[in-house]
C-alpha cells in the first residue's frame, strides 16, 4: 500500500498541460515509487485519458471518472478512493518543482505526531501574458489545500469533506474546517526544505469549474472562518491571529463580492457581521499587518479579474478600511 495518495483533479485540459507534473514525479530521486500513487480524478467521464498515457511511469496511476460536478466533487471522489495513510491535493496544471521534492516529503512520513503537514510553495502566474513566479509566505498559504498533506483517517473520522455547494473558496473552507476540528494546533507541522517544492499555477481558466453558487453555503463558510479565529485566539499570538483573519475572511469577502449569484443582502449581511466581529476583538487583534493585506490582494487578484461581476474599487477600499480599523463602529 502506498504511503501517499496524490489526488490530481482534471476537467477539460489537454494532456500537455498536466504531463510535466507526471513527468517530474517519474524523475524523483531517493524514494520508492511503491510509496506513492496518483489518483487522477476526471471531472466528467468523457474527459478521461487513454490508459496507455500512464504505462511508462514507474509509479501507479489510477483514473477515477465521475460525472461533472466541480472541483469539490472531484476532490471528494479522490478521498473516497484513497487508501494511503496520507493524501495530497494537486491541480492538473500544478507541478512539483524539483526531482528531490518527494524525497523531502516521504522522509517525514508517516509522522505519527501530526495530522496535517505543509511545505513551502510558489505561485506561478500566467495571467499577465508572461510567466511571473512569486514566493507564497506561510501567512497566505492556508487559503490553499495545495502543498498540504492530510492524514486520511483523521479527515474521515472528523467527517471533513469539500463543500459541493461552493464553486469557489473551497480550499479556504476546507482548511477552516480542518483548523476548527484540530483542537491541538501542535498537530500541524512544517516539512522544512531548502527551497519550495510545489508550484501552484494560475491561468485564465481554472482546472475544474461548476456554474452557480449557493448563498447560504458562502454565509456558513464566512461564519466558520470567524469561528476558527475565535477558537485559536487563546492558542496563537495576536500577530498570527491577525494574519488568519486577513487571509481567510478578507479573501472570502473579496471573492463573494466578485461572484455572480451572491445577493446584495448577503453582501451587506457579511459586511455587518464582520464589522461587529472586528469591533469586538479590536483591542486584542490591533491593526493587521499591511504586508499581509497586500499579499492577500495579490492572491485574490486573478479571482477578482476572472469573475463575471467585477469588484468595484469602492467595495475593495471600504472593506480594506474595515479590516484595518479605519472605520468606526456603525460606519
Write out the residue ranges for each language-model feature:
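A broadly tuned preference for mixed-charge, low-complexity surface segments
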Residues: 94, 166-179, 249-252, 301-314
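Short, surface-exposed acidic
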Residues: 166, 236-243, 285-296
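Membrane-interface aromatic/basic loop that binds lipid-linked glycans or pyrophosphate carriers
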Residues: 3, 46, 56, 72-73, ...
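Catalytic core of nucleotide-sugar-dependent glycosyltransferases
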Residues: 196-203, 209-243, 247-257, 261-281
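Nucleotide-sugar donor-binding/catalytic module of glycosyltransferases
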Residues: 1-223, 234-235, 327-331
Amino acid at each position: 500500500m502506498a504511503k501517499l495518495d496524490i489526488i490530481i483533479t482534471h476537467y477539460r485540459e489537454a494532456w500537455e498541460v498536466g504531463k510535466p507534473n507526471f513527468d517530474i514525479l517519474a524523475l524523483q530521486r531517493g524514494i520508492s515509487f511503491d510509496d506513492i500513487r496518483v489518483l487522477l480524478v476526471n471531472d466528467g467521464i468523457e474527459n478521461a485519458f487513454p490508459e496507455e498515457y500512464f504505462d511508462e511511469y514507474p509509479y501507479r496511476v489510477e483514473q477515477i471518472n465521475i460525472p461533472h460536478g466541480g472541483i469539490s466533487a472531484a476532490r471528494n471522489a479522490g478521498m473516497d478512493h484513497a487508501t494511503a495513510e496520507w493524501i495530497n491535493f494537486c491541480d492538473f496544471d500544478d507541478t512539483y518543482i524539483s526531482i528531490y521534492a518527494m524525497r523531502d516529503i516521504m522522509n517525514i512520513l508517516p509522522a505519527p505526531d501530526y495530522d496535517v503537514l505543509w511545505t513551502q510553495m510558489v505561485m506561478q502566474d500566467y495571467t499577465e501574458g508572461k510567466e511571473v513566479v512569486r514566493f507564497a509566505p506561510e501567512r497566505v498559504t492556508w487559503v490553499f489545500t495545495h502543498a498540504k498533506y492530510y492524514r486520511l483517517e483523521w479527515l474521515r473520522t472528523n467527517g471533513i469533506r469539500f463543500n459541493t455547494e461552493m464553486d469557489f473558496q473551497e480550499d479556504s473552507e476546507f482548511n477552516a474546517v480542518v483548523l476548527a476540528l484540530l483542537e491541538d494546533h501542535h498537530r500541524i507541522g512544517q516539512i522544512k526544505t531548502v527551497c519550495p517544492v510545489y508550484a501552484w499555477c494560475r491561468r485564465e481558466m481554472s482546472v475544474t469549474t461548476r456554474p452557480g453558487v449557493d448563498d447560504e453555503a458562502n454565509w456558513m463558510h464566512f461564519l466558520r472562518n470567524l469561528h476558527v479565529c475565535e477558537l485559536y485566539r487563546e492558542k496563537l499570538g495576536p500577530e498570527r491571529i491577525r494574519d488568519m483573519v486577513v487571509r481567510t475572511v478578507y479573501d472570502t469577502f473579496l471573492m463573494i463580492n466578485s461572484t455572480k449569484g451572491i445577493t446584495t443582502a448577503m453582501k451587506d449581511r457579511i459586511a455587518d457581521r464582520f464589522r461587529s466581529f472586528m469591533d469586538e476583538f479590536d483591542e486584542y487583534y490591533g491593526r493587521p499587518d499591511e504586508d499581509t493585506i497586500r499579499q492577500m490582494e495579490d492572491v485574490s487578484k486573478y479571482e477578482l479579474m476572472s469573475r463575471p461581476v467585477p469588484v468595484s474599487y469602492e467595495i475593495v477600499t471600504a472593506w480594506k478600511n474595515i479590516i484595518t480599523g479605519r472605520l468606526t463602529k456603525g460606519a
